[in-house]
Amino acid sequence: MARSLKKGPFVADKLMKKIELLHSKGEKTVIQTWSRSSTITPIMIGHTIAVHNGREHIPVFVTDQMVGHKLGEFSPTRTFRGHVKSDKKSKR
């Protein structure tokens, strides 16, 4: 179920304050955050946000096409190492 429109998008308060501060200064430094559930808003466009994936912070450069998505969508938490090769000779 989608979030109610009367509530508006969720953005962590601490993250929003950091972005507004950098936006007013005109700086483009990397912002570290653990808030993967925060929604990307238009004020975040052009900033680089390092999103935590459980092990490290992955830098995400926000573009206009990302508005409306969550920050966690752009920092994968699992590493895919490929499927196991089936060895038919060892099964016999």
Swiss-Prot record:
InterPro entries: Ribosomal_uS19, Ribosomal_uS19_bac-type, Ribosomal_uS19_CS, Ribosomal_uS19_SF. The keyword Signal does not apply. It is found in: Plastid, Chloroplast. GO terms for molecular function: rRNA binding; structural constituent of ribosome. One of its GO terms (cellular component) is chloroplast. Keywords: Chloroplast, Plastid, Ribonucleoprotein, Ribosomal protein, RNA-binding, rRNA-binding. Gene3D superfamilies: 30s Ribosomal Protein S19, Chain A. It comes from the Eukaryota. Belongs to the universal ribosomal protein uS19 family. PANTHER family: RIBOSOMAL PROTEIN S19P FAMILY MEMBER (PTHR11880), SMALL RIBOSOMAL SUBUNIT PROTEIN US19M (PTHR11880:SF8). Protein S19 forms a complex with S13 that binds strongly to the 16S ribosomal RNA. This is Small ribosomal subunit protein uS19c. It comes from Ostreococcus tauri.
